[in-house]
Amino acid sequence: MNLDLLGWSDFFTHSFVPYRQQGFSVGRVAIEYRNTYIVYSKQGELAAKVTGKLRHQATQPQDFPAVGDWVIIQTRESEGCATIHGILPRKSKFSRKTVGSKTEEQIVAANVDTVFLVCGLDGDFNPRRIERYLILAWESGANPVIVLNKADLCNSLDECISEVEAVAIGVPILVLSATNNQGIDTLKAYLQPGQTVALLGSSGVGKSTITNQLKGASVQAVQPVRQGDDRGRHTTTNRELILLPTGGLIVDTPGMREIQIWAGDESLQETFADIETLAPECRFRNCQHHNEPGCAVQQALLEGELDYSRFLGYQKLQKELNYLVRKQEQRAQLAQKERWKKIHKAMRNHHQY
């Protein structure tokens, strides 16, 4: 396989130099299973596992390879397998908080150039969900593109596009109907040789259908959505990096029923640029935009310049991010405490001998 077509660039070359001198090879993670990875490399497709050392040193989920990662490998070509010794620095990473009570980062896709945020123009259409995806996209370091699928099922297309334009300020918006192959060509501009695009969206929005149309074959199984709620049945069960005939790469991901935010203030500001632009005009620097006198945001709401549901979405996400920061700080303090416990224990054991 050609590394350049797999997304290799100068960004990774410099980091790999010392490993090349030691005789290691490099590959890109295509599929992630529980304890095994499928890696694309010069030697072809390889089944790979991480070394015991890498597993021992990993303290959190993001220390393990994710789909899209460039990894340092030692190959056993006769067996068609490899051992993963490390991960090269990530150019970008699309992450969310793990589902459940744990405050941990889950990397959905790494080293992505563009993120297609796919939304169905049927019962799935939800501008608030788009806002949540946008925050994660801006945080990732990749460029977001809104893909509105199922245009053939929408009776108010112009109205839906206007709603998206209001929440995705300055973000490209593409409209298509994947099942009819209408508008698919508009996606190809982002899938030049060596470019990686991640498809993200809830189940049933047509991500696998889009992948199949771009691939020109049914590489991903497709199932109909349920009648009544327009929800899909999680056609894609594993994240997978797929090499397209054009030379571009696409990461198809399972539908996300729960979008847990993992981001910082800058991504919130980028997503809600209209509200952030109003904030400096408030009378008080620390204005919370509730009932304070001279609040420019509240004035914009009264005059109809700012949509109230968008403002409520902003407040909700702001609270989520503040809560996440507090949980991260608590987790860091606990980790530091555990670290010092281990150091003191090691020192006591040393003095005993």
UniProtKB/Swiss-Prot annotation:
Cofactor binding summary note: Binds 1 zinc ion per subunit.
Keyword Zinc included in the entry's annotation: yes
Residues that, per the record, bind GTP: 149-152, 201-209
Homology family: Belongs to the TRAFAC class YlqF/YawG GTPase family. RsgA subfamily.
GO annotation, biological process: ribosomal small subunit biogenesis
Record-listed E.C. numbers: 3.6.1.-
Necessary cofactors: Zn(2+)
Binding site for Zn(2+): 282, 287, 289, 295
Localisation per UniProt entry: Cytoplasm
GO terms of molecular function: GTP binding; GTPase activity; metal ion binding; rRNA binding
Protein name, as recorded: Small ribosomal subunit biogenesis GTPase RsgA 2
Subunit structure, interactors included: Monomer. Associates with 30S ribosomal subunit, binds 16S rRNA.
Presence of keyword rRNA-binding: yes
Annotated keywords: Cytoplasm, GTP-binding, Hydrolase, Metal-binding, Nucleotide-binding, Plasmid, Ribosome biogenesis, RNA-binding, rRNA-binding, Zinc
Main location (coarse class): cytoplasm
Coiled-coil intervals: none
Protein function: One of several proteins that assist in the late maturation steps of the functional core of the 30S ribosomal subunit. Helps release RbfA from mature subunits. May play a role in the assembly of ribosomal proteins into the subunit. Circularly permuted GTPase that catalyzes slow GTP hydrolysis, GTPase activity is stimulated by the 30S ribosomal subunit.
Organism name: Nostoc sp. (strain PCC 7120 / SAG 25.82 / UTEX 2576)
Domain CP-type G: 102-259
GO annotation, cellular component aspect: cytoplasm
